[in-house]
């Protein structure tokens, strides 16, 4: 039964990774990053906003760093970005091959009914929470903390936001899925439910099927979580410039709101 779903996992992963690499390479080459290392360090020391970006399966943090060069509005002037890399782990959907992975994925493509591996997921969530706790301890207001992620990183973003005991600025999920069973919703605190979620998904996604993302909206609404769901026709398992432009405006709106209330 699983065999039919695992016919072409390596091909699917290759397509996902190539789409990510081509996207970031294109924008990195077309947008110069004028910030020096010393300037970035000064920015981090004065940061009042923290954005954590979680990459997809088989990818790395450094490969995604060029994304921050697209966010040039003054609202991001005092923003600290962090792009961690997942540790190497055997991945079931790739026949146990070891690759950068936040948690195990039993099968590809992912559908609304795909099995979950909550054990490895919760370990990854603890690591994300440790990163967030460190930033808050360093002086960042929880409402100025944002988690964003693509694919597997998007699924981890969702779990990390909803299982965090405090309200944070927001969580942005790109081409993700619900990585846990409905029974885990009793662990969502009332404060966690107040964190807004932005969910973006390509209708033509063949790796994390659109139905997997679409199923999130009623699930989150029933749990009492506010979620804005945006569908992108013609988009496969990748992030588009249109999605990132909307993410920028979505973040700016919340940053401005947080600034006016503080």
From Swiss-Prot:
GO MF annotation, one: hydrolase activity
EC number: 3.1.1.-
UniProt keyword annotations, A-Z: Fatty acid metabolism, Hydrolase, Lipid metabolism
Catalytic residue positions: 151, 205, 237
GO biological process, one term: fatty acid metabolic process
Highest taxon of source: Eukaryota
Protein's UniProt name: Probable carboxylesterase SOBER1-like
Organism, scientific name: Arabidopsis thaliana
Organism phylogeny: Eukaryota, Viridiplantae, Streptophyta, Embryophyta, Tracheophyta
